[in-house]
Swiss-Prot record:
Misc note: The viral particles present in feces and bile are non-enveloped, while those in circulating blood and culture supernatants are covered with a cellular membrane (quasi-enveloped).
Lineage: superkingdom: Viruses
Organism for this UniProt entry: Avian hepatitis E virus (isolate Chicken/California/Meng) (AHEV)
Protein name per UniProt: Protein ORF3
Known role: Small multifunctional phosphoprotein involved in virion morphogenesis, egress and counteracting host innate immunity.
Length: 87
């Protein structure tokens, strides 16, 4: 799953590994998915239009989330992110 936009590819769903596609994810499916998924930093109008054109809005709402994970922590290194999800 990309921690920036909450996109999950099939490989990441099976492994449960968190990543941030823009800077540390080696999974090409995740990187490709994140390029087309709405980013949280976009204005609301951009997010709404992207959600309509790329995938159903229900799919975004039903994405699996880690309840204990912090929401978009920019200070974690890739190793810290992996360590958190390997506990």
């Amino acid at each position: 799953m990309c921690l920036s936009c909450q996109f999950w590819c099939l490989e990441c769903q099976e492994s449960g590994v968190g990543c941030r596609c823009v800077d540390c994810c080696s999974c090409l499916q995740c990187a490709a998915g994140c390029q087309g998924a709405p980013k949280r930093s976009q204005p609301e109008a951009g997010v709404a239009s992207a959600a309509v054109t790329i995938q159903p809005s229900g799919a975004l709402n039903n994405a699996p989330r880690e309840p204990s994970a912090p929401p978009l922590s920019q200070t974690l290194s890739p190793r810290q992110v992996l360590a958190r999800y390997q506990m």
